[in-house]
Amino acid sequence: MTNEFLHFEKISRQTWQSLHRKTTPPLTEEELESIKSFNDQISLQDVTDIYLPLAHLIQIYKRTKEDLAFSKGIFLQRESKSQPFIIGVSGSVAVGKSTTSRLLQILLSRTFTDATVELVTTDGFLYPNQTLIEQGILNRKGFPESYNMEALLNFLDRIKNGQDVDIPVYSHEVYDIVPEEKQSVKAADFVIVEGINVFQNPQNDRLYITDFFDFSIYVDAGVDDIESWYLDRFLKMLSLAQNDPDSYYYRFTQMPIGEVEAFAHQVWTSINLTNLQNYIEPTRNRAEVILHKSKNHEIDEIYLKK
């Protein structure tokens, strides 16, 4: 065990699944298929073994937060305001953050009676491509400086205080912010915030994004496995873009497959791997729970902060 994990309890999949009584997953195989990222793999068995115990743990954290807020209200002699329970989900590109987040959204809405759950990705807080070009950092897209961190912090602050917020929308198909399009985010019972940068510090070191989170999850895997999943996803995006000239990936459908593979590998090495090693993975120990995935996408180990 490295020093990084000294304050985590390592739990095997077998032990973890025994921490929650066996119940039927509150979704169908078809629903699960519809929410998973198209290069990801997940089964109803994973839902039962990993995600139902995780939802139960989140319930414990939520109850603890509410008890503390109530006690603070008594101490301050005023009524405590209800606040959204905010969950941060981080991890590398192509590791399966989106699948985890969408699955949690369904599980929380169905295991908590009448609960409302909003899901936000931090892609919407990337600067538009034109801004990145003007600043000379288009090749740094995805790195910390390519995000409008002030806007992200402002969003979290307003949501935490029970305000509804409109945020920009990012499209992976056009590889840019969609002009004039907004996502209306309600101050729901749960707000899941997913992105590679959600545990990172903005330029203002006095305020941390993680300060806004009531629970946090890091989806982890070996670097070689993530690279393989990224390259697989890149090539699968081409099949979706074949008849869509507006897609960012369309131009690659006109290139020899060898050139496409070389380009994707170069992007992984120069951008995604560098970003992972320098900025994403170093924030891993800020999570409450680390879900480690094996080569076949199956979660084999769970690390719970002590």
From Swiss-Prot:
InterPro entries hit by this protein: P-loop_NTPase (IPR027417), PanK (IPR004566), PRK/URK (IPR006083)
Pfam families (alphabetical): PRK
Top-rank lineage group of the source organism: Bacteria
UniProt keyword list: ATP-binding, Coenzyme A biosynthesis, Cytoplasm, Kinase, Nucleotide-binding, Transferase
Residues noted as binding ATP in the record, renumbered to the chain: G91, S92, V93, A94, V95, G96, K97, S98
Pathway: Cofactor biosynthesis; coenzyme A biosynthesis; CoA from (R)-pantothenate: step 1/5
Catalytic reactions on record: (R)-pantothenate + ATP = (R)-4'-phosphopantothenate + ADP + H(+)
Enzyme class: transferase
GO cellular component terms given for this protein: cytoplasm
GO biological process, one term: coenzyme A biosynthetic process
Localization in the cell: Cytoplasm
Record carries keyword Kinase: yes
Coarse class of the protein's main subcellular location: cytoplasm
EC number annotated for this UniProt entry: 2.7.1.33
Gene Ontology MF annotations: ATP binding; pantothenate kinase activity
Family: Belongs to the prokaryotic pantothenate kinase family.
Protein's name according to its UniProt entry: Pantothenate kinase
Organism of derivation: Streptococcus pneumoniae (strain 70585)
